[in-house]
A protein has these predicted regions:
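A beta-strand edge to alpha-helix "cap/lid" segment located at domain peripheries
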Residues: 2-35, 39-130
Length: 130
């Protein structure tokens, strides 16, 4: 892959990550459905995990409601048909009526499926005593 393709792909992934987080804040399951791979593995900071259907159901039913999110990416690495995004995500989330403050380092994985980038995995690691 040429450097210009890599830069274009990195820019595309950055835009998709921004769109994904906006959809999370808005509770927009239509956009999340479009962005997520059918093979999604979404791990949460307390180690529970969802597949695509259960994640969209939780967002759609407001099981958790994202109130605030910051998500600066430290690095976007495009390797073949995959893109790895690392960074720090902080959030204020309403989970079953309780406000939860989240502060994680994360790895988000995007893959090319049928010519389009799809969000396939998320793995956070809580930052202790931040």
């Amino acid at each position: 892959m040429s450097r210009s393709h890599s830069v274009r792909d990195s820019d595309a992934i950055k835009a998709l990550e921004d769109r994904r987080y906006r959809a999370m804040l808005a509770g927009d399951t239509a956009v999340l459905d479009e962005l997520c791979s059918d093979n999604l593995i979404y791990t949460h900071s307390k180690a529970d995990h969802d597949d695509k259907a259960s994640y969209l159901r939780k967002v759609g039913t407001r099981y958790f409601t994202y109130l605030e999110i910051t998500h600066p990416a430290d690095r976007i690495l495009v390797v073949g048909g995959a893109a790895l995004v690392t960074g720090r995500m902080t959030a204020k989330v309403l989970v079953e009526g309780t406000i939860v403050h989240v502060d994680n380092r994360y790895l988000a994985v995007w893959v090319r499926e049928h010519g389009a980038w799809k969000f396939v995995a998320y793995q956070p690691t809580p930052i202790i005593n931040s």
